[in-house]
């Protein structure tokens, strides 16, 4: 059974290009900034925040994958991942 994870990556002293690189690295590893909203539409999470669904239960395993992606930016970084089995979202477009 799949688990749902949210991961937040903060790049220190980063440029917009650093976050674009991070986005590409996270995408390549199966992470997405797009998440289903309660209204059935899909919404984009803020920069540096990602969603992933995987058949593992250990947030540390997901966090390690995100750290590998962040390492590719060559910036110092902070990464936190958590598993959530129940969640809801109401992300307003444009915010």
Write out the residue ranges for each language-model feature.
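A structural signal for short, well-ordered beta-strand segments
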Residues: 7-9, 50
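Short structural boundary motif marking the start of a folded domain
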Residues: 1-5
């Amino acid at each position: 059974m799949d688990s749902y994870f949210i991961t937040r990556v903060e790049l220190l002293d980063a440029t917009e290009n650093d976050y674009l690189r991070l986005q590409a690295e996270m995408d390549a590893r199966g992470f997405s900034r797009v998440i289903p909203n309660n209204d059935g539409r899909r919404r984009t999470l803020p920069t540096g925040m990602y969603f992933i669904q995987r058949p593992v239960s250990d947030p540390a395993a997901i966090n390690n994958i995100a750290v590998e992606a962040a390492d590719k930016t060559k910036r110092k970084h902070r990464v936190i991942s958590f598993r959530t089995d129940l969640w809801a979202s109401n992300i307003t477009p444009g915010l």
